[in-house]
Amino acid sequence: MTSAKPAPLNRLRQLWREGRPTFGAIATIPSIQTVQIMARSGIDWIIVDLEHGPIDLGSAHAMITATAGTPCVPMVRIAANEPWLAKAPMDLGALGINFPMICNREDAEKAVRSVRYPPKGDRLWGPFHAPFRWGV
């Protein structure tokens, strides 16, 4: 008896490793239904935009959850390269953060540290939403 290998949690990493292009959309309207339709359309990723529109964390959580059961990877764009802005979306189940204004190496290192756990980063464990969303 053989067991099927589970699909990767974040399939974007696999697609990028293979050098394949990915396609997605940026959601600026707080609509669960729109995200469900887009996630089922065959796109690879959706970025929930917390920087340029009226989407709050509650709406972002619902929009992230709306990708469940699809291969679409939910990500969130935050308003600034500040670690505290990246924490909640990651804890809510986002599989990536789109950071604005990365202008140099220090900016990039700060962004990476904010989404990685120690010893490689500064992110703390938020056990409330993401584990239930992703079954971990």
What are the roles of these predicted feature ranges?
Residues S41-W45, D91-G96, R116:
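Glycine-enriched alpha-helix->loop->beta-strand junction motifs that scaffold or abut catalytic
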Residues H52-D56, E82, N104:
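Short, small-residue-enriched loops and turns at beta-alpha junctions
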Residues M1-I26, V136:
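N-terminal amphipathic alpha-helix/helix-capping segment at the start of soluble metabolic enzymes
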